[in-house]
Amino acid sequence: VDKYMGDGIMAFFENPPDGVISAQAAIKSAVAMQEKAIELDEKYKVQNRFPFSVYVGIATGYAKVGNIGPPEKVDYTVIGSVVNKASRLDSAGNAGDILMDEDTYFFVKDDYDIEDFGSHELKGFEKKVQIFKLTI
C-alpha cells in the first residue's frame, strides 16, 4: 500500500519489465479485497449498518517510482499516466467491480473470468480506454 486517500487506497506492485508478476499480484489482491468486502457487507446488513463496498481499478504500465517531493516532505511513491488510469478505472465502475485496462487483461486473461466492459472516455486520456471487468 502506497498511501491512503480519503476513503481510498493506492497500491503498486514492482517487478521485472514484463509486467506479468505485478498484474497477477494486483488481481490477487483485488479479489481478496472484494471477498472480504462481501463478507463485511453481509455482516453489516445483519447489524443494520451502512452497506460496505469496494471499487477497484487496475492499470499495468511504466511509472516513475521513488522518493518524490521537496526535502521537507519526501514521499516514496509512484507517479505517471498509468497511476491516473488506475484511478479513473476505479471511478468508472460500480460497487464491487474490479476493472482493468487492456495491458492488465493481457497478463491475466487465462486465469480469471473476465468480460469486456467496453471502451470508455476517461478524464485525462485523449483516446477511449478499453476496459475489462473481472467477475468473482
Give the residues covered by each predicted segment.
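Residues that recognize and position ribonucleotide moieties
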Residues: D2-K3, V56, D97-I98
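Cytosolic regulatory/linker segments at or just downstream of nucleotide-handling modules
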Residues: A63, A92-I136
